[in-house]
């Protein structure tokens, strides 16, 4: 190509042309995964280098946007940047203008592990420190974003399960660099737990990415939760999400709704349980009444048997029985049947012939009198013979 056919530019024209190409040929918005290096604040703007280890590019967050960010990166943080390209034609400088910056999952997990290890070594994270939850709390504080679907679900669940419990809803931001705000709110509530009659606190946030839950890994926030004056229940994110706040809480629930379920009894189950306990108590009392009644009856019988009148009646009955026995055994009864009672002159009974001899005087007593007789003859009975 001849020199007269080549496009000719001044430096300014070349840089302007490059800028125009970038504006027309590159996406107006893009996501950039990078690691932050050497962040510096200059005149309210945040300047930094974004690198992936093999390449780097300058980045900037203008002061107006910096104030709106929920997260401000530190040196070495992995981040996801929502950005656009800025090209300064005067010096052919290419910079990523960050519209939003969020920590990458690797950064969030690294911070989680760091705080967890520190608190475990100090004994702040220790199962033995966990406190039991109140069985039927009269009042609990609920800290979450307002309005939110998580709050709506919690309020509905509380009304269905145990409407007697008062829920004091305290709005808080739940994402970004908001740990100081949450800490201030928690400290204010802690000073009024007795005044408000609070028996537990729920810290809740609905679903989102693990990166969105990074605030609940804040070390100062977690130390405050671990030493809170009332039991703390967390319901943060999804079931698979785990934050340091979950580890220091007295109870970790999988979701915000599950946190309410953990704190409040089920009124239908309680009603059934009350009915069963009432039935058991009724059976117990009835059994006791029957036993006491039988015991009183036994004592009444015993006292009746020991009374003088009863003793006299028993003795009288014994005398009647003995009299009847004596009457049945009386000789008079046998004499009336034709038998006689024989005795010698001395009055001794004659049991048999061996007690008399010829000439003895005998007295024969009969039913209607007696007579005297003399023995003239003794005739023994013939002995029994066996064939």
UniProtKB/Swiss-Prot annotation:
CC terms in the record's Gene Ontology section: cytoplasm; exodeoxyribonuclease VII complex
UniProt entry tagged with the keyword Chaperone: no
Pfam families: Exonuc_VII_L, tRNA_anti_2
InterPro entries xref list: Exonuc_VII_L, Exonuc_VII_lsu_C, OB-fold_nuc-bd_dom
Location of the protein in the cell: Cytoplasm
Catalytic activity: Exonucleolytic cleavage in either 5'- to 3'- or 3'- to 5'-direction to yield nucleoside 5'-phosphates
Keyword entries, A-Z: Cytoplasm, Exonuclease, Hydrolase, Nuclease
Extent of the signal sequence: none
GO biological process, one term: DNA catabolic process
EC code(s) of this entry: 3.1.11.6
Quaternary assembly: Heterooligomer composed of large and small subunits.
Function summary: Bidirectionally degrades single-stranded DNA into large acid-insoluble oligonucleotides, which are then degraded further into small acid-soluble oligonucleotides.
Name of this protein: Exodeoxyribonuclease 7 large subunit
Species, as recorded: Synechococcus sp. (strain CC9605)
Organism taxonomic ancestry: Bacteria, Bacillati, Cyanobacteriota, Cyanophyceae, Synechococcales
């Amino acid at each position: 190509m001849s020199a007269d056919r080549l496009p000719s530019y001044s430096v300014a024209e070349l840089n302007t042309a490059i800028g125009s190409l970038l504006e027309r040929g590159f996406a107006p918005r893009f996501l950039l995964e990078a690691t932050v290096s050497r962040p510096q604040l200059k005149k309210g703007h945040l300047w930094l280098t974004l690198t992936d280890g093999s390449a780097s590019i300058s980045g900037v967050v203008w002061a107006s946007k910096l104030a709106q960010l929920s997260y401000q990166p530190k040196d070495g943080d992995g981040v996801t940047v929502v950005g656009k390209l800025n090209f300064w034609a005067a010096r052919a400088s290419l910079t990523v203008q960050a519209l939003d910056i969020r920590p990458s999952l690797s950064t969030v997990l690294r911070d989680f592990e760091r705080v967890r290890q520190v608190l475990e070594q100090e004994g702040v994270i220790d199962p033995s420190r966990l406190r039991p939850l109140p069985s039927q709390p009269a009042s609990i504080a609920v800290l979450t974003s307002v309005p939110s679907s998580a709050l709506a679900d919690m309020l509905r669940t509380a009304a269905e399960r145990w409407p007697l419990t008062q829920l004091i809803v305290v709005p808080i931001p739940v994402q970004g660099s908001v740990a100081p705000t949450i800490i201030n709110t928690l400290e204010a509530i802690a000073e009024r737990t007795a005044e408000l009659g609070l028996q537990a606190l729920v810290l809740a946030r609905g679903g989102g990415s693990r990166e969105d839950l990074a605030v609940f890994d804040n070390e100062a926030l977690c130390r405050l939760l671990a030493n809170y004056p009332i039991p703390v229940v967390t319901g943060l994110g999804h079931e698979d999400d785990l934050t340091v706040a979950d580890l220091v809480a007295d109870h970790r629930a999988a979701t915000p709704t599950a946190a309410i379920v953990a704190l409040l009894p089920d009124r239908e189950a309680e009603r059934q349980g009350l009915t069963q306990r009432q039935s058991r108590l009724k059976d117990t009392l009835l059994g006791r009444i029957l036993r006491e009644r039988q015991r009183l009856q036994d004592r009444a019988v015993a006292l009746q048997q020991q009374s003088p009148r009863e003793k006299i009646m028993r003795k009288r009955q014994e005398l009647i029985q003995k009299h009847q026995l004596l009457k049945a055994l009386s000789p008079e009864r046998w004499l009336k049947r034709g038998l006689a009672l024989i005795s010698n002159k001395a009055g001794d009974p004659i049991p048999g012939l061996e007690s008399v001899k010829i000439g003895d005087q005998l007295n024969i007593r009969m039913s209607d009198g007696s007579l005297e007789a003399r023995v003239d003859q003794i005739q023994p009975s013939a002995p029994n013979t066996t064939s």
